[in-house]
Amino acid sequence: MPKGTIVKALSGFYYVQNEDGLFQCRGRGNFRNRNIKPLVGDEVVFEAENKTDGYVLEIMERKNELLRPPIANVDRAILVFSAAEPTFSPLLLDRFLVHVEANGIEPLIVISKIDLLTEEELETIKQYRNDYEQLGYKVYLTSTIEQLGLDAIRKEFDDHVSVIAGQSGVGKSSLLNAINPALDIETNQISSHLGRGKHTTRHVELIPFGSGLVADTPGFSSLDFIDMEPEELSHYFPEMRDRLPSCKFRGCTHTQEPKCAVKEALAQGEIREFRYEHYVTFLEEVKTQHKRRF
């Protein structure tokens, strides 16, 4: 049986790509019975007598899976956040970072629209860039209007399956179009009434991009910490993860406990205060979600 990758899911059809071309397939009924849904990015076994009448028979084991956007087997998450319109939100960025770290995906941070900033505002954004780079993240400052930073990002897509995600209205589609004008992905102007972008991308699709594949996904602005245990959260903050073995108490939440290596590092300025505050905010959310489950 042939194998391939689902590159698009739309209206009950799954479009499977392999070396022989693109095949339009439906899922077998037993997927529904087993509560399994094929996802874009899935490696699958399928059968097809022609290019428009195939069936997905088996889904290979996934290395990871995102719920929003619904996609599997992602290598990298390109997280696009605007410096302005909408205003840069490190709180939302950290929420995304936790989400992708928890799924074993390598994040890259892109801060767009830097052409809209004053010199003082740009210095603030550069400080954030330094903060995140010190944690080991790659950070790019870009402007599609002034064509800044695009060449460096273009290389990051090669030989990877990447998802491009971020807050609605930050210019994800514009960024992809600027890097590869042949894509011509639909874009909308930001809604002046709401101060938020319209959701121009209505389905998930993997698009050939250099020697890799990229998914331009529906914009979204919130992520829930579903199924996460409270003691897990600190593992997704790199500056905390390395210090966990030095905490006195196993299962330390790094809030009230004595002899906490994380709080000691915070007091010494080795952990940025805004990152710790975000951790505490997320921890309360995780605890609330946990109580709802049990």
UniProtKB/Swiss-Prot annotation:
Q: Which family does it belong to?
A: Belongs to the TRAFAC class YlqF/YawG GTPase family. RsgA subfamily.
Q: Which GO terms describe its biological process?
A: ribosomal small subunit biogenesis
InterPro entries to which the protein is assigned, alphabetical: G_CP_dom, NA-bd_OB-fold, P-loop_NTPase, Ribosome_biogen_GTPase_RsgA, RsgA_GTPase_dom, RsgA_N
Superkingdom of origin: Bacteria
Q: What is this protein called?
A: Small ribosomal subunit biogenesis GTPase RsgA
Q: What is its main location?
A: cytoplasm
All copies of the CP-type G domain together span 63-223
Q: Which organism is it from?
A: Halalkalibacterium halodurans (strain ATCC BAA-125 / DSM 18197 / FERM 7344 / JCM 9153 / C-125)
Where on this chain does Zn(2+) bind? C247, C252, H254, C260
**Cofactor field:** Zn(2+)
Asked if the keyword rRNA-binding belongs to this entry, the reply reads yes
UniProt remark on cofactor binding = Binds 1 zinc ion per subunit.
